[in-house]
Amino acid sequence: MPGKWIFALLLLQISFCLRSAKCGKVLVWPMEFSHWMNIKTILDELVQRGHEVTVLKPSAYYVLDPKKSPDLKFETFPTSVSKDELEKYFIKLADAWTYELQRDTCLSFSPLLQNMMDEFSDYYLSVCKDAVSNKQLMAKLQESKFDVLLSDPVAACGELIAEVLHIPFLYSLRASPGHKIEKSSGRFILPPSYVPVILSGLGGQMTFIDRVKNMICMLYFDFWFHMFNAKNWDPFYTEILGRPTTLAETMGKAEMWLIRSYWDLEFPHPTLPNVDYIGGLQCKPAKPLPKDIEDFVQSSGEHGVVVFSLGSMVSSMTEEKANAIAWALAQIPQKVLWKFDGKIPATLGPNTRVYKWLPQNDLLGHPKTKAFVTHGGANGVYEAIYHGIPMIGIPMFGEQHDNIAHMVAKGAAVTLNIRTMSKSDLFNALKEVINNPFYKKNAMWLSTIHHDQPMKPLDKAIFWIEYVMRHKRAKHLRPLGHNLPWYQYHSLDVIGFLLACLAVIAALAVKCFLFIYRFFAKKQKKMKNE
């Protein structure tokens, strides 16, 4: 019997290979945390379709665990950065962003945010140098003859490895700070008059003041903020590739940009042929819950349950804040499942159970779930959209503020500030979202939009990866604007030329006028003298 199953799986993989022309070899340069969870969903599907997937794993990565992905091949290489260093940095980043970073305007981010990003840049440059300078690793990759590389541009270096190996590469990306990478390297069209800048915390139709804030954010990220220190990265890329180049220019050679978002979360804006939206690719129908959790959910009766999770990256929550949250949860008639890894609050009510881990997707897909209290991570937001669950957003850091702002603008959530939130604020927010049908209606509307696509998000991602492998590249989809320097892209040379022409014409017109004036003035004077 097992032999029959193995044979059936082999036939299934062969059928996928025939359908996609051939089975390819995919190299992956990943990022940690939720970035890895998203890209792993794509990789698992590629393996199911018969492709060979190899993941480059820096030894400093501490979340990415090869043991949990037996179907994937891993090439682990040593790094000068240790796991402890990287873990401490990300904890510091998350805590500083959550509790210290001012959010009045984007200008208030500086210099704290810039300092943190400089440290981020230094860590990843070190990891990149360790990979590219590892002759044994690079020789092995050359011999493997990969067809394509899949990377997350938030962790730069994948594009450099692809260039060294002379293979095409694609990006999988949620968003970069201020859309900096998308605009400078992808030539995305994102007018600040109606497209909220990532990390602005804005959403929906903007007022005049909102547009002023949005413009300040755009200018800040375009001219002052640097996610990667170009002074270090550009010379390194130039040295390795043996020609003058920059990090931004190399990133711009991506064949496709697979953006982990969609119009259920985003607001409409112009897009490009080599960009597709795959938000919610990790979402799937709910599976049965473990018996103990199912029994607790069923005990809620007609009131239902609330799912509470603020993610896994925030390491510290004060005892006072935890008690305030527990008190608010204890006041509602719903049962509550709270993902929490701290000291059990003294005010925890009998209706609330605390778990270190929850089957979040399966809970959100349960018919008794009434609301989701979330930090606003894209994965959790998309699972809520997928299942049509309204949200109470308590954003912590990164684009979480933007995700929740978008959900608020679309009428599927309310938002609270983790720093100023009182127990009554949370209690009132829970009552509002659970009892007001407005939020459930809009959440279901977003769910309908998400499900009503010509192709599932995961299938779109696989299609484009296989498309690039079939055609070797996708240059015919890349806008010619990639070949232009910034001043030509914005037509500044043409504008300058036209202004110069106008200036010359104006000068000639003035000279002609003066010549005619003087001619007639002299003639009139001569006539008077006669």
Swiss-Prot record:
Transmembrane domains' residue ranges: 494-510
Keyword Nucleus: no
Pfam families: UDPGT
Membrane topology summary: Single-pass membrane protein
Gene Ontology cellular-component annotations: endoplasmic reticulum membrane
EC numbers for this chain: 2.4.1.17
Signal peptide boundaries: 1-23
Gene3D superfamilies: Glycogen Phosphorylase B (3.40.50.2000)
Subcellular location: Microsome membrane; Endoplasmic reticulum membrane
Keywords tagged on the record: Endoplasmic reticulum, Glycosyltransferase, Membrane, Microsome, Signal, Transferase, Transmembrane, Transmembrane helix
GO terms for MF: glucuronosyltransferase activity
Induction cue: Constitutively expressed.
InterPro entries in the record: UDP-glycosyltransferase, UDP_glucos_trans, UDP_glycos_trans_CS
Recorded catalytic activity of this chain's protein: glucuronate acceptor + UDP-alpha-D-glucuronate = acceptor beta-D-glucuronoside + UDP + H(+)
Functional description taken from the UniProt entry: UDPGT is of major importance in the conjugation and subsequent elimination of potentially toxic xenobiotics and endogenous compounds. About 30-fold less active than Ugt2b17 toward testosterone and dihydrotestosterone.
Family membership noted in the UniProt record: Belongs to the UDP-glycosyltransferase family.
Full protein name: UDP-glucuronosyltransferase 2B37
Species of provenance: Rattus norvegicus (Rat)
Record gene name: Ugt2b37
